[in-house]
Amino acid sequence: MAEPRQEFEVMEDHAGTYGLGDRKDQGGYTMHQDQEGDTDAGLKESPLQTPTEDGSEEPGSETSDAKSTPTAEDVTAPLVDEGAPGKQAAAQPHTEIPEGTTAEEAGIGDTPSLEDEAAGHVTQEPESGKVVQEGFLREPGPPGLSHQLMSGMPGAPLLPEGPREATRQPSGTGPEDTEGGRHAPELLKHQLLGDLHQEGPPLKGAGGKERPGSKEEVDEDRDVDESSLQDSPPSKASPAQDGRPPQTAAREATSIPGFPAEGAIPLPVDFLSKVSTEIPASEPDGPSAGRAKGQDAHLEFTFHVEITPNVQKEQAHSEEHLGRAAFPGAPGEGPEARGPSLGEDTKEADLPEPSEKQPAAAPRGKPVSRVPQLKARMVSKSKDGTGSDDKKAKTSTRSSAKTLKNRPCLSPKHPTPGSSDPLIQPSSPAVCPEPPSSPKYVSSVTPRTGSSGAKEMKLKGADGKTKIATPRGAAPPGQKGQANATRIPAKTPPAPKTPPSSATKQVQRRPPPAGPRSERGEPPKSGDRSGYSSPGSPGTPGSRSRTPSLPTPPTREPKKVAVVRTPPKSPSSAKSRLQTAPVPMPDLKNVKSKIGSTENLKHQPGGGKVQIINKKLDLSNVQSKCGSKDNIKHVPGGGSVQIVYKPVDLSKVTSKCGSLGNIHHKPGGGQVEVKSEKLDFKDRVQSKIGSLDNITHVPGGGNKKIETHKLTFRENAKAKTDHGAEIVYKSPVVSGDTSPRHLSNVSSTGSIDMVDSPQLATLADEVSASLAKQGL
């Protein structure tokens, strides 16, 4: 990944030079592209790229590559349109800007974003050296990210890339952090410019997605880049064409050391060609990029190598663009930092623009690189490792601008992947209308193709940057065709993979803001856009994520092919697609209703026509229940109530036994008679045996009669065993002699002598007699 990222670094430097860095900064990658106007768009795209940042830098990369070709204004305009749809619509109606036109020249980026204006001014001052610095300082447009990364990367020798990386790193890109040391100086510059471009950062803040959601920023940045590319045909088309995450662009930049992605901030469309020729001249930055590469190898991001060439071209074509795009370039560098982690994504994003577009969009990973050259280079590096540089130089120059233009239309797809993307898409579409005459369809196609190519390239890049690179490489053969094809893919399902989102963004940017927005929002829903925008968008998230894994830089070479700005067509077609044929209202007359449902079909409710018919029941013939017919004619009425009281004649009633005697009894206290009859029980009742004797007994203390029968059996009793003991008992003598007395009559054997106790014998007889009486 270190090598691929280094390659991407080259591309990312390129992206930075072209303004991809600005986008990247915005989206962690893409934000730098249109720091001023694209900051908002970049923010949106940045979110897209930030996710890429983690593992998919393709959105940023795509944007970077797309941006590589387009000028800073193109990049700025798209970002502005995307980031601030309202602003874009009002301030930047998205007039198509010449590919070579810089953001300041076009006035697109400056109008939308104060940050861009500041960046543009700064960039104008230092056209060559400051282009890079401003690229990075513009990253301060997303200063939070750029500064963070810069601080994190004190050793960042590559200021342009450093800011980009820093911008991206705030997005949360590991690679960015790695490159932080390398980009620390850049980050410092970025901070300085950040103060200048704080307005830009606020735009990004408005984009919100850009820095806060690093990952979202990557995607959003990508979307913004694509949208920016759409707004400014070259810049926007390139990002859209890249359709890959900023890392893809970063990888492309890395893969193409000669092509500092960062250097290329907003390079003109022909900047790629210049870069090709100027790459040697850019070598000063190249060494810087080389060091960046080393750091990228260390950080897995190489931004310096490609930065100078792009910067030179950017300076040549749009020094203001470099100022603005340099800021984007810083984001592009951020994308390059991401490039390592998202490098493959960037490559993949570049793959979508195999044609010259892709080379231009190759730095798309680097939001700043707006020259497709970067993409092409990245593609070459991914595929060939070196050939990519030349291709990128070629296709990046013209195709990149075209690609960026086309990409803007494709950008809408990027928005689709993320919520921020959709917002960006609307903005992007607003910009897209600007290059409607441009190959908007191509843009949409390129993003699609790029998306698939980017994915393949990324896979290859991940595997060897050869498999996926080859897909893009295949696309490169027909760089223009592929650029168009890539843009067409925006319409077609293939595009959705990764570049599609970028392409969609570009395409949508191309279309009028309202149209593009609807396209972005609708692409996923409408079948037509689903191919162009929806497929790209839905595919784009996945594609981007895939792109990070798949190095698509080789395929990006095709991006070099200047993609005709058909993206506007794509957005238009997307719109037409989105517009579903009006569905005629169902003919209810011919519809068979459910059972009984048509009976009231003609019913017209009317409150006054209600007739209540009361039918009186003829009860004369009705046989009522027993007695119920008597009252049938009874009419309740308070005045005619008659209560018939019939007293009950009890004279004829035979009462129960004894009850008739009291029938005339009237309760009253005066006529109470109490009759007491004493019953003589003795006369009528026969008592039980022996019980009658006491029937007349009245309880009383004086009349007690106690009959006592003395039992003497104890006295006469003898123990069965003679144990020699004496039996002592109380004699039941009436006299009351209760003192125990010695039984003298007890034999020695202990047996009682009954003869000596006549009382006991008598008692026994009485008891037996009494028991006999009772029947016992």
Swiss-Prot record:
Modified residues (Omega-N-methylarginine): 472, 684
Membrane topology of this protein: Peripheral membrane protein
Modified residues (N6,N6-dimethyllysine): 480, 646
GO terms under biological process: microtubule cytoskeleton organization; neuron projection development; positive regulation of axon extension; positive regulation of microtubule polymerization
Keyword field: Acetylation, Cell membrane, Cell projection, Cytoplasm, Cytoskeleton, Isopeptide bond, Membrane, Methylation, Microtubule, Phosphoprotein, Repeat, Ubl conjugation
Subunit structure: Interacts with MARK1, MARK2, MARK3 and MARK4. Interacts with SQSTM1 when polyubiquitinated. Interacts with PSMC2 through SQSTM1. Interacts with FKBP4. Binds to CSNK1D. Interacts with SGK1. Interacts with EPM2A; the interaction dephosphorylates MAPT at Ser-396. Interacts with PIN1. Interacts with LRRK2. Interacts with LRP1, leading to endocytosis; this interaction is reduced in the presence of LRPAP1/RAP.
N6-methyllysine: residues bearing it: 594
Pfam families per record: Tubulin-binding
Known function: Promotes microtubule assembly and stability, and might be involved in the establishment and maintenance of neuronal polarity. The C-terminus binds axonal microtubules while the N-terminus binds neural plasma membrane components, suggesting that tau functions as a linker protein between both. Axonal polarity is predetermined by tau localization (in the neuronal cell) in the domain of the cell body defined by the centrosome. The short isoforms allow plasticity of the cytoskeleton whereas the longer isoforms may preferentially play a role in its stabilization.
Protein name (Swiss-Prot/TrEMBL): Microtubule-associated protein tau
Species per Swiss-Prot/TrEMBL record: Pan troglodytes (Chimpanzee)
Chief localization: cytoplasm
Polar residues bias spans: 61-71, 440-452, 736-751
Biased composition (Basic and acidic residues): 1-26, 179-189, 207-216, 293-303, 314-323, 344-356, 381-393, 455-466, 517-528
Entry keyword annotation includes Repeat: yes
Subcellular location: Cytoplasm, Cytosol; Cell membrane; Cytoplasm, Cytoskeleton; Cell projection, Axon
Positions bearing the Glycyl lysine isopeptide (Lys-Gly) (interchain with G-Cter in ubiquitin) cross-link: 44, 589, 594, 602, 616, 633, 646, 652, 656, 666, 678, 682, 688, 704, 710, 720
PANTHER family according to UniProt: MICROTUBULE-ASSOCIATED PROTEIN, MICROTUBULE-ASSOCIATED PROTEIN TAU
GO molecular function, one term: microtubule binding
Tau/MAP repeats: 579-609, 610-640, 641-671, 672-703
Name of the encoding gene: MAPT
Compositionally biased spans, kind Acidic residues: 217-228
